[in-house]
Regions:
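Beta-lactamase-like hydrolase cores
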Residues: 1-26
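A common structural microfeature
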Residues: 6-8, 38, 58
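Proline/glycine-anchored alpha-helix kink/cap motifs
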Residues: 10, 41-43, 130-131
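Short, solvent-exposed loop/edge-beta patches enriched in aromatic
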Residues: 14, 45-49, 84
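Phosphate-handling active-site elements
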Residues: 48-56
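Active-site SXXK
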Residues: 31-49
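Active-site-adjacent helix/loop patches that line small-molecule binding or acyl-intermediate pockets
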Residues: 55-177
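A short N-terminal beta->alpha junction/helix N-cap motif
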Residues: 3, 26-34, 64
Length: 178
């Protein structure tokens, strides 16, 4: 067997009535990286993509996790550069790439861990360009109180059909509420 996936499944109708289930469909789940496409919606809605000329490839790295391969890192650097931002402004924690050949190359070259290599750096770049475009503070953009995070919370609640007060949050591995 190649892989095993565990989970809880619910099939619902358009009203949310459960038609079929397996496991516990009421179990709370931490969204983690599966929330990245939702976290990217405010980037799109803000007009930052058009304003900074963000490409489809760059949007893809904003919406996803990446392995830190050179083309991923270049995409994140490009996003930041287009908005006049620096990789030093990323608050996602310093990492080596998950892509082992890239990690090995950095170590051989004596290059330390850095936020740009974090698998979540694209998402963070999207948050930063949104704040920059809307004239908001770039400081503490990961805090729940920051307008960037409040917009993400509103999108998440809307997509789930609940009030923002009903969304139970925790801080994910890269420092943002999810």
């Amino acid at each position: 067997m190649d892989q095993v996936h565990r989970g809880h499944i619910a099939v619902t109708d358009h009203t949310g009535k459960i038609l079929w289930k397996l496991g516990d469909p009421e179990r709370l789940t931490f969204a983690r990286s599966s929330a990245k496409p939702l976290q990217a919606i405010p980037v799109v809605e803000s007009g930052a993509l058009e304003h900074y000329g963000i490409t489809q490839q760059e949007l893809a790295v904003i919406c996803s996790s990446h392995n830190g391969e050179p083309f991923h890192v270049k995409a994140v650097e490009s996003i930041l550069h287009k908005a006049g931002l620096s990789p030093d402004q990323l608050c996602c924690g310093s990492e080596y790439p998950m892509y082992v050949p890239a990690e090995d190359a950095l170590k051989i070259a004596g290059i330390p861990r850095a936020p740009i290599y974090c698998d979540c750096s694209g998402k963070h770049a999207g948050m930063l360009i949104t704040a920059r475009h809307l004239g908001e503070s770039l400081e503490n953009y990961t805090a729940l109180e920051h307008p960037v995070q409040q917009r993400i919370l509103s999108v998440f609640a809307e997509m789930c059909g609940v009030e923002t007060s009903e969304v139970q949050l925790a801080v994910d591995g890269c420092g943002v509420p999810v």
